[in-house]
């Protein structure tokens, strides 16, 4: 088996070039522009060029993945914050709804009592007595500054108030 002196000499020169090339840190490798990187890679073996380019790509991908993880964590925290705010709002509205239902039930009871009283008065006067029509005033109770409910009495579009 004979060794070709030219190929061993070329291999020796390539090794010397590889050994003599300045080692680039990961930060420096990532910070280089493509033009600067290509300038650095001139004169290196194809193996060394491939290795450095692959190393640079791996480092850049790592950075992209890390920033993606950070972004995802921030989005998750923001969504959890929004969820908590919405849950508090739902609880508040449920409490307000329950309070309004109680108030409505109390008003229905008063209305029914008044209607019963009106029927008993009408029955005591007898069937021949005409009862003058009465106007109904609706009082809406709301918390100050809530802005709910009519501002100036009942809505004429909905007709007279009833208990049901």
From Swiss-Prot:
Function noted in UniProt: Since they lack a putative transactivation domain, the small Mafs behave as transcriptional repressors when they dimerize among themselves. However, they seem to serve as transcriptional activators by dimerizing with other (usually larger) basic-zipper proteins, such as NFE2L1/NRF1, and recruiting them to specific DNA-binding sites. Interacts with the upstream promoter region of the oxytocin receptor gene. May be a transcriptional enhancer in the up-regulation of the oxytocin receptor gene at parturition.
Compartmental location: Nucleus
Short name of any one Pfam family annotated for the protein: bZIP_Maf
UniProt-annotated stretches for the region Leucine-zipper: 79-93
Organ and tissue specificity: Expressed in the term myometrium and kidney.
Alphabetized GO MF terms: DNA-binding transcription activator activity, RNA polymerase II-specific; DNA-binding transcription factor activity, RNA polymerase II-specific; RNA polymerase II cis-regulatory region sequence-specific DNA binding; sequence-specific DNA binding; sequence-specific double-stranded DNA binding
Single GO BP term: negative regulation of transcription by RNA polymerase II
Classification via SMART domains: BRLZ (SM00338)
Alphabetized PANTHER family for the sequence: TRANSCRIPTION FACTOR MAF, TRANSCRIPTION FACTOR MAFF
Biological source species: Homo sapiens
GO CC annotation: chromatin; mitochondrion; nucleoplasm; nucleus; RNA polymerase II transcription regulator complex
Record-stated family: Belongs to the bZIP family. Maf subfamily.
Region (Basic motif): 51-76
Domain bZIP: 51-114
Entries under InterPro entries matching the protein: bZIP (IPR004827), bZIP_Maf (IPR004826), bZIP_sf (IPR046347), TF_DNA-bd_sf (IPR008917), Transcription_factor_Maf_fam (IPR024874)
Gene: MAFF
Compositional bias (Low complexity): 149-164
Subunit details: Monomer and homo- or heterodimer. Interacts with MIP. Forms high affinity heterodimers with members of the CNC-bZIP family such as NFE2L1/NRF1.
Top-level taxon in the UniProt lineage: Eukaryota
Major localisation: nucleus
Protein name listed in UniProt: Transcription factor MafF
Keywords, alphabetical: DNA-binding, Nucleus, Repressor, Stress response, Transcription, Transcription regulation
Induction of expression: By oxidative stress.
Region of interest: Disordered: 141-164
């Amino acid at each position: 088996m004979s060794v070709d002196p030219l190929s061993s000499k070329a291999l020796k020169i390539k090794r010397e070039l590889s050994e003599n090339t300045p080692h680039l840190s990961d930060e420096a490798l990532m910070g280089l522009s493509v033009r600067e990187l290509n300038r650095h890679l001139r004169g290196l073996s194809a193996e060394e060029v491939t290795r450095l380019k692959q190393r640079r790509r791996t480092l850049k991908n790592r950075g992209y993945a890390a920033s993606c993880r950070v972004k995802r964590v921030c989005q998750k925290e923001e969504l959890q914050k929004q969820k908590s705010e919405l849950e508090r709002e739902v609880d508040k509205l449920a409490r307000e709804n329950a309070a309004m239902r109680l108030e409505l039930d109390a008003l229905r009871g008063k209305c029914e009592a008044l209607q019963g009283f009106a029927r008993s008065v009408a029955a005591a006067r007898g069937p021949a007595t005409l009862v003058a029509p009465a106007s109904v005033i609706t009082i809406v109770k709301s918390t100050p500054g809530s802005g709910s409910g009519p501002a100036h009495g009942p809505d004429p579009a909905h007709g007279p108030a009833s208990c049901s």
